[in-house]
Amino acid sequence: MTGARGATMTGARGATMTGALVARVLTDVSGIDKEFDYTVPAHLADEAQVGCKVRVDLAGRRVGGWIVALGELSRDPDLAISPEGSRPALKAVAALRGWGPTADLVDLAAWAAWRWAANRALFLGTASSRNTVRHLPAPRLAPPAPPPALRLPTGPGAHVVAIGPAEDPTVIVAQAAQLGPLLVIVPTASRAAVLARRLRRAGGDVALLPEEWAQARAGAAVIVGSRGAAWAPCPGVAAVVVIDAHDELHTSERAPTWNSVGVAVERAERAGVPCYLITSCPGPELVALGPTTTFEAAKQKAGWASMQLVDQRSEDPRLGLYSSRLVDLLRSTEKVACVLNTTGRVRLLACGACGTVARCDVCHAAVSSPEPGVLSCQGCGAMRPYVCASCTSIRLSWLRVGTSRAREDLERLGGRDVGEVTAATKDFPSSSVLVGTEALLRRLDPSSGFATIVFLDFDRELLAARFGAAEHSLALLSTASRLVRGAAGLVVVQTRMPDHPVLQAATVGDPAVALSEEDSARRALRLPPYGALALISGAGGEAWIASLRERHDGTVEVMGPNDGKWLVKAPDHRRLCDLLRSVGPPGGNVRVAVDPQRL
């Protein structure tokens, strides 16, 4: 391994001999976000550089880590003299383990640790190859052929690019690649592989992550991968693209809840290059990041599938989720995919008299009944009497059914074999009728021939206990439109709220119909992007929150506990993240979720 030395180290511990090369190392030991200084043996000095992976001795055992800074003692004789005035003897780096993240990613990891209340090692691990890389191939920098007559804004920072759900983003990627080395982030690994094949057919040199990390580190015209690709090395990066920037798969559900959109935008701003956020659902948080560009508005609307809304309030109550329209589809010869989200995100109460779903008067989320005579919001906690807001009936009942039960019912109603798909499904069924959770939408391919997608109970999404429920619901309809190839396909939505702005927006193919109302609601409730949130939970949450309360300046609101969770709301991310950092890194018994997807 060879390479130039990285950044100059300042404020580091000293070494025992003048002129010695000292490496500041961040270890990969879980729970330790502290740097340690080591001398670099002479035979390794020419190869050591910021970002490279090393092995060092720490507390009696050998551990891995990364060099985060390098310096020569002779250039700063005051390096880390101990409080007693002596220079402690430093251990030597035991071994270099190969190429690691570039120096800019080492700096970016420090920012991400502040932004999402985490340790830097987690991000440096994501930025590193899964395998040891000791030798790099030659750079491959031939871009794909440019598309005809497509111009993109080239200013630095975020640019929101609005397209239709069924539009192919490959042409935008190919155009962006003309600027120079390009980093592309896609929601799923399977879609990243498809995009890589298309770009290669267009003559582009592509590194597909994670398998081709070494080529990315050496240099490639286009580097493509899923969420972790936001941390991929991209020497000389000239632009960044995030495809389906609205997709929640860009956000980690596990703490730290970092998202590739935020990392991509920050990375582009630091490099002074454009970051194109391609989306069919430009929600409030995306729009707040930068100006929006729309290509061919008519084509964008045509990318939405034909939407057919089935008002379940007018259906025979005995049919439950199985409307007469659904039964007709099942008894036809069409290939039908049915989506029923049973991940436990929300349980719905509906009026037995008029069929209206009970929801919060304040934030419109679903409500529950924690005690007799009371309805409580699962989102904001607001309470109201146990009556239907539409007809004042007190005959409310739970709506529940799972995918396994639904599969049996669909087989009986349609007389066809029905395949079930969940996140745990390994072998994808070959049935012409499928039922599953959102995992079905993730694994279905536009070439599979399913021209009809049915959402059996879409109200679960519209009323989910999350501040982005409307945006996420619209994103699901966008995904369905892409899978059925836009206007050529059909999306059937069973609902008790056919007038909901999300459904009206999808019907007319104009996301602004729903997202403008969503923006107004967020502004009124001081939700992102007009505020910043963190959700604290875990056995040690109470003590951690007590420490936080002692430090905040009154501009931060702490709500809870509610079911063992605390919600911290701040005017902006700077004040929120500074406060979280002042408390210190959360231990193993505390979970801190910044920008939580679900409350």
Residue map of PLM features:
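Accessory, non-ATPase domains that flank or precede helicase/AAA+ motor cores in DNA-metabolism machines
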Residues: 1-310, 317, 331-332, 354, ...
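Amphipathic alpha-helical transducer elements in NTP-driven molecular machines
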Residues: 45-48, 64, 102-106, 217, ...
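C-terminal helicase module of SF1/SF2 nucleic-acid helicases/translocases
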Residues: 50-58, 282, 324-334, 409, ...
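Conserved phosphate/pyrophosphate-binding and hydrolysis machinery centered on Walker-type P-loop NTPases
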Residues: 98-102, 166, 185, 189, ...
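Conserved RecA-like helicase motor-core motifs
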Residues: 202-212, 361-362, 370, 414-423, ...
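Conserved helicase motor core of P-loop NTPases
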Residues: 293-362, 507-510, 518
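Cys/His-rich short segments
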Residues: 326-412
